[in-house]
C-alpha cells in the first residue's frame, strides 16, 4: 500500500503475568520478532510485572513502574493473571481486580474488542453444528470502564431491620458515545452492520444508550443499525450467529455475551482480545492463567499470537502485517498441528514452544497471495 509505513520503531510493554502467561507471551514475542525480520520492522520490547507475579516481587498487583513503562509504550501485550495462590487476598489487591481491572482504568481502556472467528480446521471442536457455525465472523465491542462493575456498591440495613444491597449502574453521555462511535467505525470497515444489544424494555440506562446510538447513526448512513434485547441476543448467537457483524453493548451484558461467543469457535485457546483507548491498547488472550498446566509447555499460544496481530492492526496501523500473522496461524492449523486443547484424531500434537516455532517459520518462509482471503 503506497504511503503506508509500518517500520517502527515500536515500543511494546510485555507483561507475562501468571500461570501459563510467561510461556504464551514468549511465543507471541517470537512471532513478532520473526515478522520484524521478514518485513524490516523494529520492535523494542520492555518487560514489566502485573498480577500475582507483581504481588510476589513488589507486594502490589500493579506496580507504579509498570504504569510508567506503559505510558512510554505504543501498546501493551499481556499474558494472563491470577491463580489460586492469591485467591485469599483482599479483593482490591488480588491479581484480577488490583492488576487487570486497575490497568484498564489507569489507561482508560474503555472499549474491549473480541473477534469470534470460525476456523474450518476446527469445525468439529465447536459445540454447534458445522452448518450453523460455518462462516461466522463477529466483532464484539464491549464498554469496559463504566456500568455496574464500577458503580458505587454498598450493603445496608433497612428501617425494618432487613439486610439489603445496592449496586449502582452509571453511564455518562461521553462514555456511551465513544464506544458506540468506535462500533460504527469498525462496522464501516467490515460488512456495514451494527447491532446494539441492551434491555431497553426494562432499563433506563439502555434507553439512554439507544438515544445516543440513534443520534450517532446519522453520521454513518452506510452502516445498517439494529437493536436487540440481550436475552434474545444470547439465543440468536446459538441459533443463527451468522446474522451478526459488529455487536456493541454495555459492560455487564458484554462480559456475558463475549464469553458465550468464545465458545462458538471451539477453543478459547484461539481467541484474542483488545482493550482500547483510541490507538493505545492492551492486548491479551481471553483465556485465564491455567495454573494446572503452567510450566509444562502444554499451553496453546495461538490466542496470544493472534492478540499480537490485533495489536498490529489497531495500535500500530499495520493491517497487512496483522493479516500475515493470521494467515500463518491458519496455515499451521491447515497442516494439522495442534496443542492438546484442540487435538483431534489425525492431527499432530505439538508443545506450546513448537507451535510458536511453526507460526514463526510460516511467517519467515510462507508464500502468500496478497489477495488470499482468510
Swiss-Prot record:
Binding-site residues, Mg(2+): 231, 255, 259
GO BP term, example: L-leucine biosynthetic process
Details of cofactor binding: Binds 1 Mg(2+) or Mn(2+) ion per subunit.
Similarity section: Belongs to the isocitrate and isopropylmalate dehydrogenases family. LeuB type 1 subfamily.
Pathway(s): Amino-acid biosynthesis; L-leucine biosynthesis; L-leucine from 3-methyl-2-oxobutanoate: step 3/4
EC number: 1.1.1.85
SMART domains linked: Iso_dh (SM01329)
Reported cofactor(s): Mg(2+); Mn(2+)
Domain of life: Bacteria
Residues reported to bind substrate: 104, 114, 142, 231
DNA repair among keywords: no
Stated name of the protein: 3-isopropylmalate dehydrogenase
Lineage: Bacteria, Bacillati, Bacillota, Clostridia, Thermoanaerobacterales
Species: Carboxydothermus hydrogenoformans (strain ATCC BAA-161 / DSM 6008 / Z-2901)
Gene name in the database record: leuB
Major subcellular location class: cytoplasm
Amino acid at each position: 500500500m503506497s504511503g503506508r509505513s509500518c517500520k517502527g520503531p515500536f515500543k511494546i510493554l510485555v507483561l507475562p503475568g501468571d500461570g501459563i502467561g510467561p510461556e504464551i507471551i514468549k511465543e507471541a514475542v517470537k512471532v513478532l520478532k520473526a515478522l520484524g525480520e521478514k518485513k524490516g520492522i523494529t520492535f523494542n520490547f520492555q518487560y514489566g510485572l502485573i498480577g500475582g507475579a507483581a504481588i510476589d516481587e513488589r507486594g502490589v498487583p500493579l506496580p507504579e513502574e509498570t504504569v510508567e513503562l506503559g505510558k512510554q509504550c505504543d501498546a501493551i501485550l499481556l499474558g494472563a493473571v491470577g491463580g489460586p495462590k492469591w485467591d485469599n487476598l483482599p479483593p482490591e489487591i488480588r491479581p484480577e481486580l488490583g492488576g487487570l481491572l486497575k490497568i484498564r482504568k489507569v489507561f482508560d481502556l474503555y472499549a474491549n474488542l473480541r473477534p469470534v472467528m470460525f476456523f474450518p480446521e476446527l469445525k468439529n471442536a465447536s459445540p454447534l453444528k458445522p452448518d450453523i457455525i460455518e462462516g461466522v465472523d463477529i466483532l464484539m465491542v464491549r464498554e469496559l470502564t463504566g456500568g455496574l462493575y464500577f458503580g458505587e456498591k454498598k450493603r445496608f440495613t433497612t428501617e425494618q431491620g432487613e439486610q439489603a444491597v445496592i449496586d449502582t449502574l452509571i453511564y455518562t453521555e461521553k462514555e456511551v458515545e465513544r464506544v458506540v462511535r468506535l462500533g460504527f467505525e469498525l462496522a464501516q470497515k467490515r460488512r456495514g452492520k451494527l447491532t446494539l444489544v441492551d434491555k431497553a424494555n426494562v432499563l433506563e440506562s439502555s434507553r439512554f444508550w439507544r438515544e445516543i446510538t440513534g443520534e450517532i447513526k446519522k453520521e454513518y448512513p452506510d452502516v445498517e443499525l439494529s437493536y436487540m434485547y440481550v436475552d434474545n441476543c444470547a439465543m440468536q448467537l446459538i441459533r443463527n450467529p451468522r446474522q451478526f457483524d459488529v455487536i456493541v453493548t454495555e459492560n455487564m451484558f458484554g462480559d456475558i455475551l463475549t464469553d458465550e461467543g468464545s465458545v462458538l469457535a471451539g477453543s478459547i485457546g484461539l481467541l484474542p482480545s483488545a482493550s482500547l483507548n483510541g490507538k493505545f491498547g492492551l492486548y491479551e488472550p481471553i483465556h485465564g492463567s491455567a495454573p494446572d498446566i503452567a510450566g509444562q509447555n502444554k499451553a496453546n499460544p495461538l490466542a496470544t499470537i493472534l492478540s499480537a496481530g490485533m495489536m498490529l492492526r489497531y495500535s500500530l496501523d499495520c493491517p497487512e502485517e496483522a493479516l500475515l500473522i493470521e494467515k500463518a496461524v491458519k496455515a499451521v492449523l491447515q497442516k494439522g498441528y495442534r496443542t492438546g486443547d484442540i487435538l483431534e484424531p489425525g492431527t499432530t500434537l505439538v508443545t506450546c514452544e513448537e507451535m510458536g516455532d511453526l507460526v514463526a517459520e510460516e511467517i519467515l518462509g510462507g508464500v502468500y497471495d496478497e489477495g488470499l482471503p482468510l
